[in-house]
Curated annotation (Swiss-Prot):
Keywords: Keratin, Repeat. Belongs to the KRTAP type 10 family. Residues 26-228 are annotated as: 22 X 5 AA repeats of C-C-X(3). Interacts with hair keratins. It comes from the Eukaryota. In the hair cortex, hair keratin intermediate filaments are embedded in an interfilamentous matrix, consisting of hair keratin-associated proteins (KRTAP), which are essential for the formation of a rigid and resistant hair shaft through their extensive disulfide bond cross-linking with abundant cysteine residues of hair keratins. The matrix proteins include the high-sulfur and high-glycine-tyrosine keratins. The lineage of its organism: Eukaryota, Metazoa, Chordata, Craniata, Vertebrata. InterPro entries: KAP (IPR002494). Restricted to a narrow region of the hair fiber cuticle, lying approximately 20 cell layers above the apex of the dermal papilla of the hair root; not detected in any other tissues. GO terms for cellular component: cytosol; keratin filament. This is Keratin-associated protein 10-2. The gene is KRTAP10-2. Sequence repeats lie at residues 26-30, 36-40, 57-61, 79-83, 89-93, 99-103, 104-108, 109-113, 114-118, 120-124, 130-134, 145-149, 150-154, 162-166, 172-176, 182-186, 187-191, 192-196, 197-201, 209-213, 219-223, 224-228.
Length: 255
């Protein structure tokens, strides 16, 4: 045993009587050598490096070795210890910034997110990126891209087919409780635009929107008639004198 040990540690252990007391320097080879942080060339109980954690060669290697157990906390990321996959794409945020293969990261933190028209949208169980900006999408998108609970498509244009299929208040209704101008009735569904306030209002007395409205049109609010919140088809005046009321043809005064 002494002879074999002497041949390995001959540079540091010059005399046979020094074998059992081999200096620690024979184990602390320069960083970069194959035996760096390797099993001690002399007797293990004597020559195992005691400063493995602080050794620069341990921290740089991070490879399985005899001394890794002594410096795991320093040279092995915490994500590496429990994960069998590549942890790099998980460190930036709770969810990935771009579509990533699910096996790459642990599901607990790295559910794939939606990046544009990628197929990642269809398979994602996490709230995709196209839903993060607001409670409803800003423009019409394919429903499969986002969960229905938060991302019902909204109406971007009055002629958009998205209006007809939307169960959310479309864009043409969001500006105010009542529309600012005549709008095609199909654009705002009754389920989201209550007839008492959100039916089309007219921009002028001659507008056909007035005649088709199911609620008090705006052409009645300029006179002494009741405001547009009234559900009556008539322009009921609120003035004390009938002479001061302006009526459309076919309408009756209740003054």
């Amino acid at each position: 045993m002494a002879a074999s040990t002497m041949s390995i540690c001959s540079s540091a252990c010059t005399n046979s009587w020094q074998v059992d007391d081999c200096p620690e320097s024979c184990c602390e080879l320069p960083c970069g050598t194959p035996s760096c942080c390797a099993p001690a060339p002399c007797l293990t109980l004597v020559c195992t490096p005691v400063s493995c954690v602080s050794s620069p060669c341990c921290q740089a290697a991070c490879e399985p070795s005899a001394c890794q157990s002594g410096c795991t906390s320093s040279c092995t990321p915490s994500c590496c210890q429990q994960s069998s996959c590549q942890p790099a794409c998980c460190t930036s945020s709770p969810c990935q910034q771009a579509c990533c293969v699910p096996v790459c990261c642990k599901p607990v933190c790295c559910v794939p997110v939606c990046c544009g028209a990628s197929s990642c949208c269809q398979q994602s169980s996490c709230q995709p990126a196209c839903c993060a900006s607001s409670s409803c999408q800003q423009s019409c998108r394919v429903p499969v891209c986002c969960k229905a609970v938060c991302c019902v498509p909204t109406c971007s244009e009055s002629s958009s087919s998205c209006c007809q299929q939307s169960s959310c208040q479309p864009a043409c209704c969001t500006s105010s409780p009542c529309q600012q101008s005549c709008c095609v009735s199909v654009c705002c569904k009754p389920v989201c635009c209550k007839s008492i306030c959100c039916v089309p209002v007219c921009s002028g007395a001659s507008s056909p929107c007035c005649q088709q409205s199911s609620c008090q049109p705006a052409c009645c609010t300029s006179s002494c008639c009741r405001p547009s919140s009234s559900v009556s088809l008539l322009c009921r005046p609120v003035c004390s004198r009938p002479a001061s009321c302006s009526f459309s043809s076919g309408q009756k005064s209740s003054c």
